[in-house]
């Protein structure tokens, strides 16, 4: 999937507000789109994330997105991470954060 890259960093979309997650509440096969897709990134960059709802997702990505919970869309932000990084979205009570895999925060057993 295409990603938005700026100055060697990739845009990662996530919702740091408590209450409802964004990609963390979606089915696994839909998460990559919700995290990286340029259409979503551009909505955030244009301060239009509040316009993202179920119908917007269906119109842009298809029927399989009609059950994505969009309650967290109004809190969407972008974290720019180094291109090629392994990332995952962590979630607690709807609050999402971006975790970047590196040798500083992972240990081998």
Identify the function of each model-found stretch:
Residues 1-109:
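Catalytic phosphate/metal-binding cores of nucleic-acid and nucleotide-processing enzymes, i.e., regions
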